[in-house]
Curated annotation (Swiss-Prot):
Keywords: ATP-binding, Nucleotide-binding, Stress response. SUPFAM superfamilies: Actin-like ATPase domain, Heat shock protein 70kD (HSP70), C-terminal subdomain, Heat shock protein 70kD (HSP70), peptide-binding domain. This is Heat shock 70 kDa protein. The keyword Nucleotide-binding applies. Pfam families: HSP70. Belongs to the heat shock protein 70 family. GO terms for molecular function: ATP binding; ATP-dependent protein folding chaperone. PROSITE patterns: HSP70_1 (PS00297), HSP70_2 (PS00329), HSP70_3 (PS01036). It comes from Plasmodium falciparum. It comes from the Eukaryota. InterPro entries: ATPase_NBD (IPR043129), Heat_shock_70_CS (IPR018181), HSP70_C_sf (IPR029048), HSP70_peptide-bd_sf (IPR029047), Hsp_70_fam (IPR013126). Disulfide bonds: none annotated. Residues 666-675 have a biased composition (Low complexity).
Amino acid sequence: MASAKGSKPNLPESNIAIGIDLGTTYSCVGVWRNENVDIIANDQGNRTTPSYVAFTDTERLIGDAAKNQVARNPENTVFDAKRLIGRKFTESSVQSDMKHWPFTVKSGVDEKPMIEVTYQGEKKLFHPEEISSMVLQKMKENAEAFLGKSIKNAVITVPAYFNDSQRQATKDAGTIAGLNVMRIINEPTAAAIAYGLHKKGKGEKNILIFDLGGGTFDVSLLTIEDGIFEVKATAGDTHLGGEDFDNRLVNFCVEDFKRKNRGKDLSKNSRALRRLRTQCERAKRTLSSSTQATIEIDSLFEGIDYSVTVSRARFEELCIDYFRDTLIPVEKVLKDAMMDKKSVHEVVLVGGSTRIPKIQTLIKEFFNGKEACRSINPDEAVAYGAAVQAAILSGDQSNAVQDLLLLDVCSLSLGLETAGGVMTKLIERNTTIPAKKSQIFTTYADNQPGVLIQVYEGERALTKDNNLLGKFHLDGIPPAPRKVPQIEVTFDIDANGILNVTAVEKSTGKQNHITITNDKGRLSQDEIDRMVNDAEKYKAEDEENRKRIEARNSLENYCYGVKSSLEDQKIKEKLQPAEIETCMKTITTILEWLEKNQLAGKDEYEAKQKEAESVCAPIMSKIYQDAAGAAGGMPGGMPGGMPGGMPSGMPGGMNFPGGMPGAGMPGNAPAGSGPTVEEVD
């Protein structure tokens, strides 16, 4: 992709940082330049890129190219990695999602979910982090092509309700993609920056961000005043979004097909299901602007065509429980922030699913008729805010971002297990981060030599109902009666929402600590290093494959160009029949070889092109010698010869990539030498 024209970014080259919204279904990337955010289009010209990765017999595809071939290759096209990242295979949400996915998910070490695909004829297993890293790498490449510079630094967004292990896993994905992840920030907070960046000096405002995307849902309540963005409360569901609405529509159509076709069940056919899902997603989008949508698919299953018209009312009925559930976190944040509905100055809708009219209506009714703000693009707001935060962290001195301060919160309470399996909270949810809190604990039994510190996150009274983040031992406590030793435990949560826990025995000063990395769910450093190397290898393979395809296309263009010219009556008249036959025979033989060798190597294609050129170029150049003789010699001071390449393609629709050697030149000039050839209209 050519780099975009425009002035250079106002940061030193090494300091350029991008903001990436890594979405469940689509991702988006932005960069701060010239006092504004540029949302960067991909090589297809789209400002959002599908979070899809496909594996075929020959190549790896990412983004639009992957999504476009999903119906042909459903088992090896991976999406929804965000619904797996940082989770365990046994979690109910993972088990439920697996019923809708055409690709295979298996349980790996420590119940880590592993995605199985066939790539280049071999079975391969990937961690969700690796799939996400491939999407991130694509976003990085899009930004590099746009800026014409190498990029290392990035801010990546996550749902506000992502837990510690999901945040760590997202950070790991960035590392595997070759990025230095400067900060992990919450999606609704990023959207609030997009909303409030240019609204300074208008007094204190309470903003509710309602962020419903493809796979996750967040609500955050912020106070914005003079460039200070303070999150008051956050709530949500990391497993609710547009895909769940798609699933309802798909299930409806599967049952409808069964009813219309004597019980035929297409749900076990992954290709039919994928084609149906694509049309259901399209219908859902149509229903945001029309009152009905028709789903039509030729030969959907066992040769049977399928057609159904779905009204907006029917779609709303299918999903009404989901739609109503979105209001529960809204009530929760208002309660947590100790605020009533009337105190909310603005409701900002973010995420593609907020385009659904019923959701807009429910929010309007909830806020007593208040219209939601539509001044920001729901698909791009999160990446916009991430790009602003990236600029701040990389030291940008622009006026717009200079005085901007972001005060985010931790979304879940953090604590440890005490006697009886009780959850003792040290950091309450919605505490502003970074935060540090210490508390004194003691032993439960006489002469207890050590303690086990078990760290949990969650809101339930007993630890068994919460999420274990990690544990460690503090040993070497001097013998003493119970309740005498003093153990100071400190929880320190950083700006990424990632936790460090330290325990110190006061009398001896003995201490131990843990960075909560959810050892069971998280990748080891060795695994990350291996994945970084694999990512480089896959990237090199992609590049090699691109060059191979270019060489094949070059050979094909050359052959068809010569063939087309030889079929032109005017050109035929200038050549001997034997010469035409020689050229035609060579070209036909090579085209037949091409047909049988679609997967040949780059060198083989280039060798065949040289072979074709060595036979055809001297003969074809005679046409131009005649013309040049009549016109008083060829340009470039070579009477009767050709200047290393043909600056303006041959008549008859011919297009010689890399130029064509003339009569006085060796007949095997490599493709790519000489001026670029353009086709004459």
